[in-house]
From Swiss-Prot:
Protein name listed in UniProt: Iota-conotoxin-like R11.7
Gene3D superfamilies given in the database record: 4.10.40.80
Function of the molecule: Iota-conotoxins bind to voltage-gated sodium channels (Nav) and act as agonists by shifting the voltage-dependence of activation to more hyperpolarized levels. Produces general excitatory symptoms.
Record localization: Secreted
Natural source organism: Conus radiatus (Rayed cone)
Domain notes for this protein: The cysteine framework is XI (C-C-CC-CC-C-C).
InterPro entries assigned: Conotoxin-I_CS, Toxin_19
Tissue-wise expression: Expressed by the venom duct.
Positions of post-translational D-phenylalanine modification: 44
Any one GO molecular function term: toxin activity
GO cellular component: extracellular region
Family: Belongs to the conotoxin I1 superfamily.
Amino acid sequence: GPSFCKADEKPCEYHSDCCNCCLSGICAPSTNWILPGCSTSSFFKI
């Protein structure tokens, strides 16, 4: 994934913290860009 994304399963607070910052506060796998409760494409490449 993009180099600015944090590692999968690391803590996140904002959509800029990782490719998929879930509502649970954990980065989802960067290979899964659309997951329930996680960031969607509108959050990417900001």
